[in-house]
Amino acid sequence: MVKVKQSEINIGMVGHVDHGKTSLTRQLTGTWTDTHSEELKRGISIRLGYADCEIMKCPKCGAPEAYSVSKTCPVCGTKTKMSRKISFVDAPGHETLMATMLSGASLMNGAILVIAATEKCPQPQTKEHLMALDALGIENIIIVQNKIDLVDEERAKESYNEIKEFVKDTVAEKAPIIPISAHHGANIDILLNAIEDLMPTPEMDEGAPARLYVARSFDINKPGCEISKLKGGVIGGSIIQGTLNSGEKIEIKPGLKIVEGNKIRWESIITKITSLGVGGKTVKVAHPGGLVGIGTELDPALTKSDSLSGCVAGAPGTLPETLSEITVQTKLLDRIVGSDEELIISPLKSNEALMLNVGTATTVGIITSARGDMADMKLKLPICADKGDRIAMSRRIGSRWRLIGYGIIQ
């Protein structure tokens, strides 16, 4: 079996719709990650796009020209060496897909905020995505000023000043602003250099019991497949600690919904790992970082159409409890961003329904009691989470869910 290098860090590609996130991901990875949106019965679910990128460095040239994604140096033609392998999570920029962006953010160790120079900054989702990074505690940020090939020098400078003004007093205040053209590949070397300098590989605890956030799940069998050739269901996600080995057993929580009369309970699923896939290659052991596909012995009917996304998987008996009620310490934003008018955020009140994102899970919490900055909530769909985990909270305003702050599970 070939030794496959796994991605060491997950970087989110965030920003307003049509500002060039997917084009930039394609320029860096060669993969068009466009995501299919489909509204599933558990609220809105649109797939995140994922792609791996190998950052290559020329041993002869100096930085930033030394960095590229090519096997030979574009400047001098020397054979390049791999500096690091990284994974991009391409989050949707459309306002209705905020829930997906938030569930993708739990997989991100850093983010590239893409802002087009062709439009006034900030656009609604540019603001909302930056607030989300802040709420979820993502501090390693690089700002990319895209589409500089479509504006003159005067507008490029004006756009730069708008961005500077916009990020003042936010988590991205000190982030570098790199002007690029994703379409023509201009300044990609400078961006890669910045990623290497400013986004260190996070320290993951490989000795801890394995834990993985499930972001996707599917049935890989084609219709009409012979029974003897059927393959078990596949789950995909990111390992946040520990390692997974082919042949091991894993537990998936909250797992299966079981209805008995008028009672509903959730039962965790235990299955065996039949295969592990990383970057399109099969491996025996999967480590934290990047995205891992896990073949299992599960009935594919249980995994089709992302039905297990939002679950947590790991070594049996080591996962947190499945919670259907939680107490959170909340921190609300000052105002709602992402829409044309910015409304002041009123305090939480009893019986209010909030959309909650924790890990890759999305659920609705009904507030049973709100006092000061503490709130008790009953969850429509249970979650598997630990004390101290961060939850992004959104409130329904008009026909949209809008981010209003975050909470820490008590």
Swiss-Prot record:
Name the Gene Ontology molecular function terms of this record: GTP binding; GTPase activity; metal ion binding; translation elongation factor activity; translation initiation factor activity; tRNA binding
One GO process term, biological-process aspect? formation of translation preinitiation complex
| The reaction(s) this protein catalyses | GTP + H2O = GDP + phosphate + H(+)
User: Which amino acids does the record list as binding Mg(2+) 2?
Assistant: 18, 43
Q: Where is this region: G4?
A: 146-149
Give the region (G2) as residue ranges: 43-47
The EC number on file is 3.6.5.3
Q: Where does GTP bind?
A: 18-23, 146-149, 181-183
| PANTHER family given in the database record | EUKARYOTIC TRANSLATION INITIATION FACTOR 2 SUBUNIT 3 FAMILY MEMBER, EUKARYOTIC TRANSLATION INITIATION FACTOR 2 SUBUNIT 3-RELATED
Name of this protein: Translation initiation factor 2 subunit gamma
Species lineage:
Archaea, Methanobacteriati, Methanobacteriota, Methanomada group, Methanococci
